[in-house]
Structures are given as structure tokens and as C-alpha cells.
Regions:
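Loop/turn-rich, solvent-exposed surfaces of beta-rich toroidal or solenoidal domains
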Residues: 303-332
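Per-blade loop-tip surfaces of WD-repeat and WD-like beta-propellers in eukaryotic adaptors/scaffolds
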Residues: 68-78, 113-135, 139-143, 153-177, ...
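Beta-strand-rich domains and repeat architectures in extracellular enzymes and scaffolds
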Residues: 83-107
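Intrinsically disordered terminal extensions that flank WD40 beta-propeller domains
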Residues: 1-83
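Loop/turn segments within WD40 beta-propeller blades
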Residues: 93-99, 136-142, 148, 179-185, ...
């Protein structure tokens, strides 16, 4: 169900509150044979003339699987892992900074916590929002998880216990986006359909500053030193707000439609943006950069009439970028050549978020088909 702005209104009724037992983790292991289902003295060898790409031989005595095919590049149980359990569209997903777990959420208002390795079990469900969850972020050390919701609040969760430790209230409409500061006091910035960007200190009650924007704000992030907030929205501009002067210091122009995702590179020099004009751009946000800050434009991914907030992300080393796309594909580009490295199929709905694992060659995607995929890349 979408509101007039193209984003979901809050789901109503108990149908959107599945119990823990209703949530079933479904995992598809690509082309694998389970030796446990065979007699103990049997060895299994493909007998078809046309053999599969990956030939799997089950050695019964050692109870191990040996894969004959392309070399593995990650510690995932299989090259592709599928996780099901959400009752509605998945809008957001993030790896924990330690890489061992991940969180996902969306229209069903539930935050599901998953193991990355092994069987990828859904080991916890966090409840508390009364509206769709639009964005999730862990803080730098992974101790807290932040969630922005259409219930006009931002949840602050203890990622170890799953307890909600704070509820940030002050916005008067949907909160589309949130982002915690990388360093210093635990600040978080938020953006809303009420046309404001707010700055919060989780130790204090209420926002510590509000920046007034003219139009709805769809994406926010901090700069690397956490003394500036960058915001994008339906006015097609990226605005940079200075927290020491409490004012707008410059605006970056170039996109021809709403900006739905922002992501800062790990070293803090470049900003990535995803827009409904069907381009992804890299901007130089270093001090004293040239006035024309847009340094690269990437094409391939698509937005459509659904107007979902499609996000974007950097790999940890900055060599790759990824973006969500309404055409059901995961797009990954090389940042140097601007070439599409991967256009990954699998989802049956708009891919709303794609993120890179903090340590391994793994990408995670969440989509409107209610599913999450993890896959290893080269």
C-alpha cells in the first residue's frame, strides 16, 4: 500500500505481526546434495550425460561435500544464500560491523536478525515500530542499531540484547532515513517528509538541532568527521549542513530527479548518490574541492513508478559501488572504469538495498519480493 508520495503507509491490523514461530528461514543451497539423506555406504556421482556446472561428490565415510567447480571466494555455506521470513517488502538490510550477523526490515515493521554463516538462521525479531521501517544502520562499533520508520520515530536498539533503548520523537511525518556518526559522541541525523533534517544525541531527550529544508528529505549521511550532514530529497539537490555554524554551506547540483540514497566512502572523501533520474553519481566532498564536485556518473540501474527509496553503497576498499534497482537486478560497478561488473538476477521485485560485507567478497540485497539474498563475488 503506497501513499500519494509513493512510499508505504503504515500497515494495519494483526496480519502484519507474525509470531516468532511463523517466521521460517528458508535457505536454498545452490546445486548441493545432502549426504545425510543417503545411505551411509553410498557415494553419489552425477550420472547424467550433461553434467551440472558444479559437480558435487558426497563422501559418505567422512560426511563431507567436495565441490568441483569455480573456486569459492567467501565463507558462506554456499555461493548463494536465500533468506525468507519477512511478511512484506524488504526496504533495508545491513551487515553488523563484525560481519557475523545482519539486520533487515521493511513494510512488516519487524527487524529480523540473521546469522551470516552456517544456515543463516533468523535468531531474533525486534518489535516496536507501528509503521514500515525505511532504513537501518549500525553505529561504528555495532553496539547500537538505528531504525527510521513511517511511524515518525527513530528506534535505537541494543544489538546484543535486542532491547529498544531509546525512541527518538520529534518529526511530524514519515522518517525516511537515519545515519549515526562515525566518531565522537553518539550522534544520529535523520530526514523526514516533514521537510526537516534533525540532529540527535542519543544521551539527550529531543533533537539538539533542526535544519529546515523546503521539500521532503529522503536520504542523509554524515561526513567523515561528523561535523557536517549531507541530505538529499525530492528537490534533486544534495545539501551540506555545517554543525558548527548550524547552517547550509553548499549545495551540489546535477541530478534531474529525487535523490533516494546517499553513502559516504570509507575514507570519507567521496559521496555516492542514487537518484530517480536513473543515474548513480560520485561527488568529491573534500574541503576546498573544485566547485564542480560531481566526478563520475554511472548508469544501468532503473527507478520506476513505484518510487521506492533505492539505496546505494561502497565496498570497503572503495573499488566497487552497488545500487538498488527497480528492474529486479543487483548492479555492481567498478569505480575506476565505471564498467558494470555484475548484473545479478534472482529477485522477483524491486531491489531496494544492496550492501557489501565488511570483510569478505559478499553482497547482500533486500527486495520487494520479501526476500534477502547473499552472494559471493570475485
Amino acid at each position: 500500500m503506497l501513499n500519494s508520495g509513493g512510499r508505504p503507509s503504515s500497515p494495519e491490523g494483526s496480519a502484519f505481526e507474525p509470531t516468532r514461530s511463523d517466521i521460517v528461514t528458508q535457505i536454498k543451497l545452490a546445486s548441493m546434495i545432502d549426504p545425510k539423506k543417503r545411505a551411509a555406504d553410498m557415494a553419489i556421482v552425477p550420472t547424467a550425460v550433461k553434467r551440472p556446472r558444479n559437480e558435487l561428490v558426497a563422501a559418505a565415510q567422512s560426511q563431507q561435500l567436495m565441490a568441483m567447480g569455480p573456486p569459492r571466494t567467501s565463507s558462506l555455506q554456499a555461493p548463494i544464500m536465500l533468506m525468507s521470513g519477512h511478511e512484506g517488502e524488504v526496504y533495508c538490510c545491513k551487515f553488523h560491523p563484525n560481519g557475523a550477523t545482519l539486520a533487515s526490515s521493511g513494510f512488516d515493521r519487524l527487524i529480523l536478525m540473521w546469522n551470516v554463516y552456517g544456515d543463516c538462521e533468523n535468531y531474533a525479531t525486534l518489535k516496536g515500530h507501528s509503521g514500515a521501517v525505511m532504513e537501518l544502520h549500525y553505529n561504528t562499533d555495532g553496539s547500537m542499531l538505528f531504525s527510521a520508520s513511517t511511524d515518525k520515530t527513530v528506534g535505537v536498539w541494543d544489538s546484543e540484547t535486542g532491547e529498544r533503548i531509546k525512541r527518538l520523537k520529534g518529526h511530524t511525518s514519515f522518517v525516511n532515513t537515519c545515519y549515526p556518526a562515525r566518531r565522537g559522541p553518539q550522534l544520529v541525523c535523520t530526514g523526514s517528509d516533514d521537510g526537516t533534517v534533525k540532529l540527535w544525541d542519543v544521551r539527550k531527550k529531543g533533537a539538539i538541532h533542526t535544519f529546515q529544508n523546503t521539500y521532503q528529505v529522503l536520504a542523509v549521511t554524515f561526513n567523515d568527521t561528523s561535523d557536517q550532514i549531507m541530505s538529499g530529497g525530492i528537490d534533486n539537490e544534495i545539501k551540506v549542513w555545517d554543525l558548527r555554524q548550524n547552517k547550509l554551506i553548499y549545495t551540489m547540483h546535477g541530478h534531474g530527479d529525487s535523490i533516494t540514497g546517499l553513502s559516504l566512502s570509507s575514507e570519507g572523501s567521496y559521496l555516492l548518490s542514487n537518484s530517480m533520474d536513473n543515474t548513480v553519481r560520485i561527488w568529491d566532498v573534500r574541503p576546498f574541492a573544485p566547485k564542480e564536485r560531481c566526478v563520475k556518473i554511472f548508469q544501468g540501474n532503473l527507478h520506476n513508478f513505484e518510487k521506492n527509496l533505492l539505496r546505494c553503497s561502497w565496498s570497503n576498499d572503495g573499488s566497487k559501488i552497488a545500487a538498488g534497482s527497480a528492474d529486479r537486478f543487483v548492479y555492481i560497478w567498478d569505480t575506476t572504469s565505471r564498467r558494470i561488473l555484475y548484473k545479478l538476477p534472482g529477485h522477483a521485485g524491486s531491489v531496494n538495498e544492496v550492501v557489501f560485507h565488511p570483510e569478505e567478497s559478499i553482497v547482500l540485497s533486500g527486495a520487494s519480493d520479501k526476500r534477502l539474498y547473499m552472494g559471493e563475488i570475485q
